[in-house]
Design a protein with these regions (language model features):
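Conserved pre-motif I regulatory segment
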Residues: 2-44
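Conserved RecA-like P-loop NTPase helicase motor core
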Residues: 543-553, 603-705
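Signature of the SF2 helicase/ATPase Hel1-core->accessory helical subdomain module
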Residues: 63, 76-79, 87, 265-410, ...
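A substrate-engagement module of RecA-like helicase motors
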Residues: 2-13, 66-67, 72-293, 425-432
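Conserved helicase motor "Helicase C" RecA-like lobe of SF1/SF2 P-loop NTPases
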Residues: 578-602
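Conserved RecA-like ASCE P-loop NTPase motor core of nucleic-acid helicases/translocases
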Residues: 68-74, 503, 572-578, 699-700
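Walker A/P-loop
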Residues: 38-57
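A contiguous, basic/glycine-rich beta-loop/short-helix subdomain that forms a polymer-engagement track
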Residues: 259-293, 308-310, 412-424, 428, ...
Length: 737
């Protein structure tokens, strides 16, 4: 088999634009992955930039005869796998031997035909305000109210999708007719082929929605700018789409607009209980993936799979985590839960539309509980909540508010269930006829969502010693969140014993295997290096002579150094910062001192900003944490990367605080240092993206030259030449032309 792996790999690389140059690191990785899969051993692979690590694991996966799930942290990598790498593998193999593949998204990335029917003309969804953290409309007419919006927290919780972003991303039809089985991307479910344009359910979507009154929005969403206009455009698209994949839309709907016509897997009652279930886009996607050999998903989706007890993805033998340095953070987030007042209010509002007026008091009681919870959470904003403070016998304000919300939500859910029993599930709560089953479907969804809310509220009252609770105040109103302190024990029980795992990244954080709970006796670790000539093509400059950051002279000295470096580079600079304040201060100080265009994060959306930087070789881009990873600007547009300081994690991060408490005296080296080293390496890695790239990385933090822990940080960086001389750095840059 190892020989087959090398032969197939050679056949694929010979067709690449690079002309088929052999990559020893890629071949070493492919052989190691092949051995790991055949022997059932876990493997952690550090594969530096330029290795071609995706083919290094996809080729042995394709030849293994096993069902393999590949989990990635970014949409860009998913697109690369589905649009380039997997089709190349399919084309290189004989018909009948090539693997089929699908790229899966979460259920909420697909149009829900039932919700679309309810929100369309003749639909019965109530008008609800948007949830916590979601703006109602950015001031555009028609944005004030969302028809039938059960609120994003209620519908989408537990299915985050950073790879796609809240604005949705991913791609449809990834794969290949025939051998490569088309699919969907990025978040959740697989599917079966439908083979034609679909018609919508009979609840009114068969005709064009032209009046805002049809949506219960007194609104003008002219040109699709308002929420009403966006929903109308989505419903128009719904009549012609074959996949229901949000990525097919010709515009980017707001989270609120898309939430009106979608649903998360957690809150979907299932196709067999849904009037539109036999036409469900998400179920078809899931069936298609179940028939595929290789399934590409978002890492958050894999976390949701684990959190659900394995109910999300099809059975599989092997899981590959690309961008493995993200796994710990993603799993920490995915295996947690959260409760906010917006989620509670949404449940009450939706329930009110389903219950007879005699039950309004139950909905009102839940709304009152939501307001009380908001008030109780306020003093805790941004702080950890000790587990005992939420116990049922605690009489503090927060514990009392949680208990009150729990009791009242339970009562409301019981009323909904009883209403369904009385109606014989054929009429809605007001006694109106329900021939299409729309009211029943809404009640089923609301009961399910209410049950999940009860579960999460119960969880809050019984937080274990291995969990951390805190109040997140980043949204419109505070939210109580719970996460595991360490994910290793959970993964050691629920994941690693079940299937072979391959974890790979250009930067594998120190101690990653241990923190993820990988069994040492069944796990191998290798580093296949990088084919790039860092020693001759790149220089690491550490500004050892800069004054201490607390000094009044620090900002001026940093600006002087940056201006000198940028001048020597002829622009072509990506300046990375650890805070918005530092970024704006540096931009203001440097802008008038350089004769080059200076772009600042926030001037444009990230894709447009990156493209503007890439297209003009004399442009500088100043950016914060969102640009430390995943930004690829090869060639002459980038010759200098500056990093304002070592990117240590925030001291007030609740999960990391809990980990520090647990680690005791070793907290800095076991908690903070590995994360700083990984992010520093990611930032440094923005410079050399191809074998011909050259330039300087300038770290404007003297601690990298003087601190006792500098060796741990330097040891994870590519083997560049190093200097503490500004003259050496400017001379290197000047010599690039």
């Amino acid at each position: 088999m190892a020989g087959d792996v090398t032969d197939v790999l050679d056949g694929i690389t010979s067709t690449l634009p690079s002309g088929g140059e052999r990559r020893p690191g890629q071949e070493e990785m492919a052989r190691a992955v092949d051995r790991a899969i055949r022997r059932g051993r876990n493997l952690v692979v550090q594969a530096g930039t330029g290795t071609g690590k995706s083919l290094g694991y996809l080729v042995p996966a394709a030849l293994s005869g096993r069902t393999v799930v590949v989990a990635t942290a970014t949409k860009a990598l998913q697109d690369q796998l589905a649009d380039k790498d997997l089709p190349r593998i399919v084309d290189s193999m004989p018909p009948g031997e090539a693997p089929t593949f699908a790229v899966l998204k979460g259920r909420s990335n697909y149009l829900c035909l039932q919700r679309a029917a309810e929100v369309g003309p003749g639909g019965r969804q109530p008008e609800l305000a948007p949830p916590d953290g979601i703006e109602a409309g950015a001031g555009a007419p028609g944005n004030e109210v969302l028809p039938g919006h059960e609120q994003l927290e209620l519908l989408g919780i537990g299915e985050p999708d950073p790879g796609a972003g809240r604005a949705g991303a991913g791609r449809a039809g990834a794969g290949r007719a025939g051998a490569g089985a088309g699919a969907t991307a990025d978040r959740r479910m697989p599917g079966a082929d439908d083979g034609g344009t679909r018609s919508l359910p009979s609840s009114g979507l068969g005709r064009t929605a032209t009046s805002s009154d049809a949506f219960g929005i007194g609104g003008q969403g002219i040109g699709g700018q308002g929420i009403g206009g966006q929903v109308r455009r989505i419903l128009d698209w719904a009549r012609t789409t074959e996949t229901g994949d949000r990525a097919e839309l010709s515009f980017e709907p707001t989270p609120t607009a898309w939430a009106a016509v979608s649903i998360s897997a957690r809150d979907c009652p299932g196709a067999f209980r849904c009037p539109s279930g036999n036409q469900c886009f998400a179920e078809r996607a899931r069936a298609r993936a179940a028939e595929s050999d290789i399934i590409v998903v978002n890492t958050h989706l894999y976390g949701a799979h684990l959190a659900s007890g394995g109910a999300v993805l099809p059975p599989h033998d092997v899981v590959v985590f690309d961008e493995a340095h993200e796994v710990e953070a993603v799993m920490t987030d995915s295996l947690g839960s959260e409760v906010g007042s917006g989620r509670i209010r949404a449940l009450a509002t939706q329930a009110r539309s389903l219950l007879p007026s005699s039950a309004d008091r139950d909905a009102d009681a839940v709304l009152e509980a939501a307001t009380a919870l908001d008030a109780a959470l306020g003093p805790w904003a941004g702080r950890r909540v000790p587990p005992g403070d939420l116990a049922p016998d605690n009489q503090d304000a927060l514990a009392v508010a949680v208990q009150r919300a729990l009791r009242r939500v339970e009562r409301l859910v019981d009323a909904l269930r009883a209403s369904g029993d009385r109606d014989g599930r054929g009429r809605d709560g007001s006694g109106r006829d329900d021939p299409d089953g729309d009211a029943r479907a809404r009640r089923d969804r609301t009961v399910l969502a209410g049950g999940h809310l009860v579960d999460d509220l119960n969880h809050l009252t019984a937080i274990g010693d291995d969990e951390v609770a805190w109040v997140d105040d980043a949204g419109r109103s505070p939210t109580l969140r719970v996460s595991p302190i360490e994910v290793g024990p959970i993964l050691a029980e629920s994941l690693w014993p079940e299937r072979t795992a391959i974890l790979t990244s250009a930067t594998v954080p120190p101690g990653l295997a241990h923190r993820l709970g990988l069994p040492p006796d069944d796990t191998d670790e290798i580093d296949v290096g990088s084919p790039f000539d860092y020693e001759h093509h790149a220089l690491l400059y550490v500004a050892a002579d800069l004054p201490d950051r607390r000094s009044p002279q620090a900002e001026g000295a940093i600006a002087d150094t940056m201006a000198a470096l940028i001048e020597a580079a002829g622009g072509r600079t990506l300046a990375l910062f650890t805070s918005w304040r530092a970024m704006h201060a540096a931009a203001e100080a440097v802008r008038e001192r350089i004769p080059f265009t200076l772009l600042v994060q926030g001037d444009l959306p990230k894709p447009a900003l990156t493209e503007a930087f890439r297209s003009d070789p004399e442009t500088c881009l100043f950016a914060t944490m969102g640009f430390w990873q995943g930004v690829d600007v090869p060639g002459r547009s980038l010759s200098l990367v500056t990093i304002d300081r070592i990117p240590f994690p925030r001291p007030d991060d609740p999960v990391l605080q809990a980990r520090r408490d647990r680690a005791g005296p070793s907290a800095f080296r076991t908690v903070d240092l590995p994360r700083a080293a990984t992010l520093l390496a990611q930032g440094v890695g923005r410079l050399v993206r191809t074998s011909s790239d050259r330039g300087v990385v300038a770290v404007l933090d003297s601690r990298l030259a003087k601190a006792g822990y500098r060796k741990e940080l330097l040891g994870i960086l590519p083997p560049m030449r190093r200097t503490t001389s500004l003259a050496d750095a400017t001379s290197f840059l000047a010599g690039l032309d």
